[in-house]
From Swiss-Prot:
Name of the protein in its database record: Phosphoribosylaminoimidazole-succinocarboxamide synthase
Organism: Bacteroides fragilis (strain ATCC 25285 / DSM 2151 / CCUG 4856 / JCM 11019 / LMG 10263 / NCTC 9343 / Onslow / VPI 2553 / EN-2)
GO BP term (any one): 'de novo' IMP biosynthetic process
Gene: purC
Keyword NADP among record annotations: no
Family annotation (Gene3D superfamilies): ATP-grasp fold, B domain, Phosphorylase Kinase, domain 1
């Protein structure tokens, strides 16, 4: 099992490359983007030292499936998936915010709530809520899109408009799409015995039209609970059974790492790496309802290059 942690392609018409935390994005002729989902894994805004075999393939295939399942809600950037780890799409001018939508009080929102915070991103939260409780209606809590190495910051709708990050008309569309996509994601999850707890969407503009970009409803961008036993666990105040990369965050915290200054990432043994890979495969199969088919990992970069070149030559 090999993992792809860095790419250095030179595709025809390539103008630039951006290396994100997990994805490497190649700009082709200022018209298309070749997005490679690597096997890098990040937690607490830090890229961990070891890659996770098959993770990129899983994320790319889940995102492609959900992009295809939501084209009636809003246009999206995807044109093709020439390789299991690659999506090629329309180059959009991205909004510098991530649209986060939460159906339940958990994660960072719960940590803030527990400490007395009753307003997140300008959204007032009801009193007396418990961890993992469902909100009366899903709430939208955007964040800024941080540069590599910096943390994303919460931002309110008012601040987004005041800073000119989106016009009122644009923001209304972003919010409408966000809630409609979350509703669809929730319905698809329910068919699989899952609860879509929270997720994030990114949008951009192309020729004046707002497009959904990047990945959607993947375990990297979303948190899922198992529906079975949710209510009992909630009533007893027990931790929910999660389908997300929370298990990676928990392992890091148990080993004294929370992404804070001066903390060192714990050593990731082959056994830890393999167990994370297996958990991701479980996520894939639960979320999609399909068996995960492992691609040959003997020479991933060569395979990707060949497949993308063939697509671009069309």
């Amino acid at each position: 099992m090999k993992a792809l942690t860095k790419t250095d392609f030179n595709f025809p018409g390539q103008k630039s490359v951006y290396h994100g935390k997990v994805r490497d994005v190649y700009n082709i002729n200022g018209e298309q983007l070749v997005m490679v989902a690597t096997d890098r894994i990040s937690a607490f805004d830090v890229v961990l030292p070891e890659g996770i075999p098959y993770k990129g393939q899983m994320l790319n295939q889940i995102a492609a499936k959900f992009l295809d399942a939501t084209t009636d809600i809003c246009p999206n950037w995807k044109l093709a998936t020439p390789d299991p780890m690659v999506t090629v799409g329309v180059l959009c001018e991205g909004f510098p915010v991530e649209m986060i939508v939460r159906g339940y009080l958990c994660g960072s929102a719960w940590r803030a709530y527990k400490n007395g915070v009753r307003e997140i991103c300008g959204v007032k939260l009801p009193e007396g809520m418990k961890e993992n409780q469902k909100f009366p209606e899903p709430i939208v809590t955007p964040t800024t899109k941080a540069e590599m190495g910096l943390h994303d910051e919460d931002i309110s709708k008012e601040e987004i408009l005041a800073q000119g990050l989106a016009t009122p008309e644009e923001y209304a569309i972003l919010e409408k799409y966000t809630l409609a996509l979350f509703k669809r994601g929730t319905e698809i999850a329910a068919e699989r015995g899952l609860i879509l707890v929270d997720t994030k969407y990114e949008f951009g503009k192309h020729n004046g039209t707002i497009y959904l970009m990047d990945e959607i409803h993947t375990p990297d961008s979303s948190r899922y609970f198992y529906a079975e036993g949710y209510q009992e666990r909630f009533e007893k105040g027990e931790a929910q059974k999660q389908l997300s990369k929370e298990f990676v965050r928990e392992w890091l915290m148990e080993n004294g790492f929370q992404g804070k200054e001066g903390q060192k990432v714990p050593e990731m043994t082959p056994a830890i790496v393999e167990s994370i890979s297996e958990r991701y495969i479980e996520l894939f199969e639960n979320i999609t309802g399909e068996k995960f088919v492992k691609e040959d990992t003997s020479n991933i970069a060569e395979r990707i290059e060949k497949n993308v070149m063939a697509f671009l030559a069309k």
